[in-house]
A protein has these predicted regions:
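Conserved ATP-binding module of the ATP-grasp superfamily
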Residues: 2-30, 99-100
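Conserved divalent-metal-coordinating catalytic cores
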Residues: 21, 34-385
């Protein structure tokens, strides 16, 4: 069978007219007891940034490597202190660096396996050819500086602030989803506009009007490097009914953050799978989760009553809330027409700049704030349905 397989490979070269005396066929013994297999790029395959990109699957099968069906990815900075590398990947990184020295290249595409004895097996090494050439590459040292700056920024933002909980988690999709709306690498204008219109304060003003805790002043979005993230501590605090006592608010936020830490795959589903933001018909059974997480019957009852009160008030006040929001959007529209009319008579650079500022402020005050409230009500409707 081995002989037939080798002859089949040789025939394929002939069919493709790939007749080269340098062609070779390498035979590896079958690797047993594989627990992890995958592909590692020694730099990011698109931009060539200094990260080991490990795409992997866990289990005995290695077919995911060849089929391209691997769904797990981890990125490790090339200049990271080796002691900080997760034990799971430490030996693999050592092997990769050894290969880089042998072939004198740090742009490689490597197929690998790891056995249950933590032995690294290299199946294939080839050049990484997908890196896009740019007119100006960012030096690795500059990336190191950005990482150091981001670490300092995170440490500062993670410190206890005026909100409940002594730590936070940053997510790119947990609330107001910047990853989807402005992208993972937004330009300066996109980021600043989204921050001004929504993430600086409109996001919590709308919620506070509905009876949730007012987290003023708290900016929801932060940028690390060029990527926007949502501060989940601020988000989770803003979705607690204001009537709950302070001690219980803190306990609830800590529970939410702990659950997100243990279930990071839920970061785009926090409204439905982590938080209790309104009363719905499954709430009493869902609140049972709190019993095994240190909440007393009295505390659970207080949370349930507060959510019921909040939800009833929102439903009863909805006609007025809706009417008020519509009035604000109509005011925004009328102001826009007035500004456009004034510009027709005097379209100077100064007037254009003034008009832009007026329109942005109107969008924020008369558009984004009511939208924040209505979006929250829409989420409540989705949860109840």
């Amino acid at each position: 069978e081995i002989s037939n397989a080798i002859n089949s490979v040789i025939s394929s070269y002939k069919i493709k007219n790939n007749r080269n005396n340098q062609n070779q066929i390498l035979i590896q013994s079958q690797t047993l007891n594989i627990v992890i297999s995958g592909v590692v790029f020694t730099r990011t395959p698109d931009a060539g940034s200094p990260y080991f990109v490990i795409n992997f699957e866990e289990g005995k099968l290695t077919t995911g490597v060849t089929k391209g069906s691997i769904g797990n990815t981890i990125k490790i900075f090339r200049k990271i202190n080796h002691k900080l590398i997760p034990q799971k990947w430490a030996n693999l990184i050592v092997s990769i660096k050894e290969i880089e020295k042998i072939v004198n290249s740090d742009k490689l595409d490597i197929e690998f396996g790891i056995t249950k004895n933590n032995q690294v097996v290299i199946f294939q090494v080839r050049p990484l050819t997908s890196i896009k050439r740019k007119s100006k590459d960012i030096p690795d040292n500059d990336v190191s500086k950005i990482i150091l700056k981001s670490k300092k920024q995170f440490k500062k933002l993670n410190n206890p602030l005026q909100l409940y909980s002594n730590k936070t988690i940053f997510s790119d999709m947990a609330d107001w989803n910047p990853a989807e709306i402005i992208g993972n690498n937004p330009n300066i204008l996109d980021y600043s506009l989204y921050d001004f219109l929504i993430m600086k304060n409109s996001w919590y003003i709308g919620r506070a009007k509905l009876g949730y805790q007012n987290v003023k002043p708290y900016r929801l979005m932060r940028k690390f490097g060029s990527k926007p993230y949502v501060d989940t501590r601020g988000s989770f605090n803003s979705l607690i009914p204001d009537g709950i006592n302070q001690k219980l608010k803190k306990k609830l936020v800590n529970f939410y953050l702990k659950k997100l830490t243990n279930n990071p795959h839920l970061h785009d589903k926090v409204e439905f799978d982590i938080l209790f933001t309104c009363y719905d018909f499954t709430l009493p059974s869902r609140l049972n989760e709190l019993k095994i997480n240190g909440f007393s019957k009295f505390e659970i009852s207080e949370i349930e009553k507060a959510l019921l009160k909040l939800t009833i008030e929102i439903i009863e006040k909805f006609p007025k809330i809706s009417s008020d929001c519509l009035s604000l959007t109509n005011k925004m529209s009328n102001n826009r027409k007035k500004i456009e009319s004034e510009l027709e008579h005097s379209r100077t650079t100064k007037n254009l700049i003034i008009s832009i500022e007026q329109l942005l402020n109107d969008c924020k005050k008369f558009g984004a704030v009511p939208f924040s409230a209505m979006a929250r009500i829409a989420f409540i409707g989705s949860v109840m349905l």
